[in-house]
Amino acid sequence: MGRHGGPAAAGPTAPSAVRAKAVNAPSQVFVRIAILAALLLLAVYTAFGVHRLQREAMAQPGGAPLAAKADLIAGRVDANLAAQRAGLSAAADLLKRDPGATMDAAETTLRAAGGEAAAVAVVSEAGVVAVAGRDDGADWKAAALAAGASGRTNWVGSVGETGRLYVATTTSLDRARAFVIASGDASRLVADPEKGESGALALPDGKLIAARGRGVQGAGALREAFALSIEDLGDGPAAVRGQAADGALLDVAVRPVAQGALLAVAAAPTRSVANLDRQVMEGAFSLLVPLGVGIALALLLMIQSRKAEVAHREFIDSERRFRLAVEAARCGIWEWDLNGDQVYLSDVTGAMFGWGGGGVVSGQDLLERISIDHRERVRQALANAAMYGAFDVSFRVPASEQGARSLWIDARGQGFGKPGSEGHARIIGVALDVTEERIAQARAQAAENRLRDAIESVSEAFVLWDRQGRLLMCNRNYRSVFSLEPKILKPGAARAEVNRFAALAIKQDHPAPDGAKGVREAEMMDGRWIQISERRTAEGGLVMTAADITAIKTQEEARRRNEEQLQNAVAGLERSQEQLAELARKYETEKVKAESANKAKSEFLANMSHELRTPLNAINGFSEIMMNEMFGPLGDQRYKGYSQDIHSSGQHLLALINDILDMSKIEAGKMNLKFESMHLEDVAEDAVRLVRNRAEAAGLKLDIDFPQLPEIEADYRAVKQVLLNLLSNAIKFTPRAGSVTVRAEVRRDPFGDLIKVSVTDTGIGIAKEDLARLAKPFEQVESQFSKTTQGTGLGLALTKSLITMHDGVLEMHSTPGEGTTVSFTLPVRHSDQKITRDFVAA
């Protein structure tokens, strides 16, 4: 602080004025003793002196001690109200930020009050929204009406005959006016009086809220307790004369509290001087007793001085207790002189701003201790307080270089004294350290945000009601499942009203099949099924979740239909069992017949082929002799041509018979292969050598492209026949000037290494839709070119069968007009354990 003057010697407060009066009392006693000593010889002057003392005593009944006790009650009430208003302000700020946090607001006020409030409620125009603490029959609605009727932002008072003190602050809830109200026992604020004395707390209209002590129990107003009206009490600090219910005279001191909203009352029996009056008056004209009267009067004045000192000590003690009460409530006191820009700070307030204690500082020094972001709002609050009287602002005090920690302070005050042309010149108020409350609010807000995020992230519908059946929170899935408008789901909405709208989306519902308590299943209007679960919370609220079980219901329905279909199928199977048995017998009979017919066919073909080959060999032999003119010229050259045709036709017929014979052996299972180690290059060269003359005669180029290959285990004759068939087909269907190429390569396979052999030609090609028919016996593809060639369609079928017997695969790739590639794979090592591979035609 720029000019820190240390602890203030005195502040402009009512307790200081009373203390000054008490200090001046001893000097008045000595003056009176000196005057009486000078007038002891004159009885008549003695009588007048005694009479003057009596008037002075009557003018200030009760003296400083009684006023101090009234100030003590007022100070205790102010400290109580300051603590409660701090909590109410924090709750009002919380409701402005989050209208749904009504219960958090009530609990925040209850904690901030530090035990000064028994219960806290949030009351809206619709009624009581939330209550925290011990309710004990508090009339919250009446208190809210009284607070609203007062027209003040902060209101204190009492309603009904309950002896409760209510403190309220005005806020907003869903754009409507609402009140946060604290309630407590008013009798706690009135300390236990000493013997014969009494204390009370009253409203400005004279109604007693709380009273303790002699003759005031059960009294409802100041007139009943002290035989005084509000007009009798007056505006000054002096005590007035009253009368107890039993007729005893009382000295009554009154102090306004909370800007006149309450009156603190202290009363004590009047110190009687009636006996002294009688003694003095009776001996006033006696010359024998003036000395005694003077001595008695001196003793009386000394006693009064002693009592004044005692009252002064009591005032010091009461002031100390008041400070302890304020410090215990973490409440600092301050006074701002706006004209002189001087601020008086109590020890607690000075410590809040980073100084070691209280004192008087300049307003600029104080503002420099406030966060730069909040200084303007403090200046604005001071300007408003000067104009309208009320001061209420929250600001942060950063950590100081001396090591003081950063604090949040709520400062509240009121204009003091009669306002002038520029408004109030002084603002008196309290400062509350609300750092812990701010931290708690931030943590609570963070926890609530995490809870809301978690609730929003769950796939189920979720809704939470409080114990009064009011809506606290829900997630988007709840709104979606029950097709509810956002305006229906405002915080605080009645559960019955929300359920009425939610029921419109439900087609039917019934208890869960397993009979679980609080669980039911519902079919929605859109066809979905949900499982609704309800349970009570520890605070008496209700949690409801709704999970989508449409998939489960669909599966159950499908399972039910499947069970019905299965039962029908079983019944049908039982009915057709005899028919199936009869069909099985017929099938077995037909199977035997088919196998016999197929075997007979194969045997017939084998026999016929053998019978045909015998005469055919003679035809081929003699035609070859005639063609080569081994026994001389035949004469006409046409005979030689005829013999060539006979030999060519015979060779073709022999090849056809051989194919039929081999095919029959394969179908009859009589074809035996002899697997032996061999080089595929040797087989290929042998096959190419046999067809090379035909290729050259057809004007074709015949190439072989074989790399270094490993030995394989295969049947030499069968592999050679496969290559001859493929080469013959390629030569047969390739036009002149075309080419035929034989290639081989090694392929890696999980079942063992393979050798792939390909025969590629540049012939007429085959359409894609005809490829699948080619490997079947006696199948040929009709084309303009094929009409000029001979064949039975057994070549590829026989080739495929021989490759399959080698555990190989035949593949065909062809493009019409471009050529055909026929390839097959053979395992390097033959195994008795056959591996099935399908024929691939592409």
Curated annotation (Swiss-Prot):
Residues annotated as domain Histidine kinase: 607-830
CDD domains given in the database record: HATPase_EvgS-ArcB-TorS-like, HisKA
PROSITE patterns: HIS_KIN (PS50109), PAS (PS50112)
SUPFAM superfamilies: ATPase domain of HSP90 chaperone/DNA topoisomerase II/histidine kinase (SSF55874), Homodimeric domain of signal transducing histidine kinase (SSF47384), PYP-like sensor domain (PAS domain) (SSF55785)
E.C. number: 2.7.13.3
Phosphohistidine carried by residues: 610
Pfam family, one: PAS_7
Keywords in alphabetical order: ATP-binding, Cell cycle, Cell membrane, Differentiation, Kinase, Membrane, Nucleotide-binding, Phosphoprotein, Transferase, Transmembrane, Transmembrane helix, Two-component regulatory system
Keyword Kinase listed: yes
Membrane spanning stretches: 29-50, 283-303, 343-363
Domain named PAS: residues: 318-389
Cellular location(s): Cell membrane
One example GO MF annotation: histidine phosphotransfer kinase activity
Cellular component GO terms, alphabetical: plasma membrane
Membrane topology: Multi-pass membrane protein
Catalytic activity: ATP + protein L-histidine = ADP + protein N-phospho-L-histidine
GO biological process: cell differentiation; phosphorelay signal transduction system; regulation of DNA-templated transcription
Function, as annotated: Member of the two-component regulatory system involved in the regulation of polar organelle development. PleC functions as a membrane-associated protein kinase that transfers phosphate to the response regulator PleD, leading to its activation.
Protein name: Non-motile and phage-resistance protein
Organism listed in the record: Caulobacter vibrioides (strain ATCC 19089 / CIP 103742 / CB 15)
Phylogenetic lineage: Bacteria, Pseudomonadati, Pseudomonadota, Alphaproteobacteria, Caulobacterales
Gene name linked to the record: pleC
